[in-house]
């Protein structure tokens, strides 16, 4: 499948034309960034290890990274539930992490500022995402929808080349609203103009942010989960998933199907 992208794209275009004639097709994709188009864990690890070295905080082992990731994930979930603001979670996650590692928690705010910049230094594509996005240019409208910070995401999108391929970029800090909140998507749809909700597909790795947000917005949802479909996770999140993909190349199949 992956060895003949031109054939796949040709079939996709033919399928899109057929569905356009029948009045049913996906015309717009909303892409998540971290963990979907770009490997966030790789960037996270590189950024933290680099700053540990800069601040002489000792060796930053994989075990430490795992502990931080768990703390970080908990705080982002609280942001999605509206329990905390983004400025609060960005600093408090490092305060908690530093406290657990015997590091001065007062370093958290300064560390986070540098961390946001460093996050954009490491670009690792998920499943050849750059070429996938590029191949869909002119076939569907494509937009970034991300809760990531403006500093980090602007740098990532520029260095990765993904930003220039998009028809628009929507960051929660700019919108002053977070996924999965309806206000986030209301502003997105206001900006992109008239589009039928059934013609819009959101692709993302987070059930609680991307998929729940898609449910709130009344659009099609595609969960990117390399480990495969997990009905227990879906049930626990309480969301409706239209499609599950383990590789971004499967987006072609999804577009042909919907």
Regions flagged by a language model, labelled:
Residues 3, 7-29, 42, 134, ...:
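Asp-based, Mg2+/Mn2+-dependent phosphohydrolase catalytic module
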Residues 119-123, 147-148, 223:
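Short, flexible loop segments at the rims of nucleotide/cofactor-binding pockets, characterized by
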Residues 85, 123, 144, 201-202:
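Residue-level marker of alpha-helix boundaries and capping positions
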């Amino acid at each position: 499948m992956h060895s003949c992208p031109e054939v796949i794209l040709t079939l996709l275009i033919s399928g899109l034309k057929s569905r356009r004639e029948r009045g049913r097709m996906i015309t717009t994709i909303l892409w998540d960034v971290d963990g979907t188009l770009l490997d966030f864990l790789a960037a996270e690890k590189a950024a933290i290890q680099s700053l540990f070295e800069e601040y002489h905080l000792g060796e930053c082992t994989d075990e430490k990274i795992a502990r931080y990731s768990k703390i970080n994930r908990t705080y982002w979930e609280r942001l999605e539930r509206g329990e905390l603001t983004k400025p609060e979670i960005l600093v408090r996650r490092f305060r908690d992490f530093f406290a657990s590692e015997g590091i001065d928690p007062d370093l958290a705010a300064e560390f986070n500022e540098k961390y946001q910049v460093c996050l954009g230094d490491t670009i690792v594509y998920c499943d050849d995402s750059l070429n996938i996005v590029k191949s869909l240019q002119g076939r569907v409208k494509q937009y970034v929808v991300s809760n990531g910070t403006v500093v980090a995401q602007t740098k990532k999108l520029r260095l990765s080349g993904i930003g220039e391929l998009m028809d628009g970029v929507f960051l929660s800090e700019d919108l002053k609203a977070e996924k999965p909140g309806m206000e986030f998507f209301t502003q997105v749809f206001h900006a992109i103009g008239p589009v039928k909700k059934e013609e819009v597909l959101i692709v993302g790795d987070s059930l609680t942010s991307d998929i729940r947000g898609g449910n709130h917005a009344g659009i099609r949802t595609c969960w990117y989960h390399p480990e495969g479909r997990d009905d227990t996770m879906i049930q626990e999140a309480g969301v409706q998933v239209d499609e599950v993909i383990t590789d971004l190349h499967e987006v072609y199949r999804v577009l042909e199907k919907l």
